[in-house]
Amino acid sequence: MVDGFGPRGYPNGFPRFSYDSRPDELNEVTVRPLDAYGALAYLRTRSDVVADRIALQGWSNGASATLATMSATAPGITAPTPASGFRAGLAFYPACGLKGQFADGIKPYAPVRVFHGSADEEVSPRRCAELVAKSRALGGDVQLQLYPGAEHGFDDPSPSRQDDEANADATRDAIPRAIAFFSGVLKP
């Protein structure tokens, strides 16, 4: 797991509801994809990693970075394909405003799945639904799984999240769905 926050002075990540005040050096659209592609390059040097079967997954702001990274126009890679970039991306409850960079949608170069709660109190599930619809209209293989009543961080295993029935239901569905997605796209 790449830690783009700690080395840049944010060892605990961002405080909740701080989207508009985050520093440029942690921009999820222009900087964090570079971290992801740096990690990909490193992983491909390892003998214990199958170099052409690496996927990307992120949660919250990391999910936003995942969406930007999976774009065919992401910084850090030229003309990406599933063979040269990541095989797939999985984004759990991203903020889909993406600094206004993808107002017309994202055309991912590999399949992307987005999991979001309809009652997310931190970022807009409506905005993600709009982004996914625009991205699909561009021909992107991107799908949204919207969980009724689930909140931001619905898959957090703590009782404070899992005692909420909608969060628990979403978690029980999302985990096997994520495993099945990655199993399908990462098979030889």
What would you call each of these model-derived segments?
Residues L26-L34, E122, R126, Q145, ...:
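Soluble non-cytosolic domains of exported or imported proteins
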Residues P7, G97, G153:
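Active-site loop signature of alpha/beta-hydrolase-fold enzymes
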Residues L26-P108:
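Primarily recognizes the serine-hydrolase "nucleophile elbow" in alpha/beta-hydrolase
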Residues D141-P188:
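C-terminal catalytic histidine-bearing segment of alpha/beta-hydrolase fold enzymes
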Residues T81-L146:
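The feature captures the conserved acid-bearing segment of alpha/beta-hydrolase catalytic domains
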Residues M1-T45, D156-Q162, D169:
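Serine-hydrolase catalytic machinery in alpha/beta-hydrolase-like enzymes
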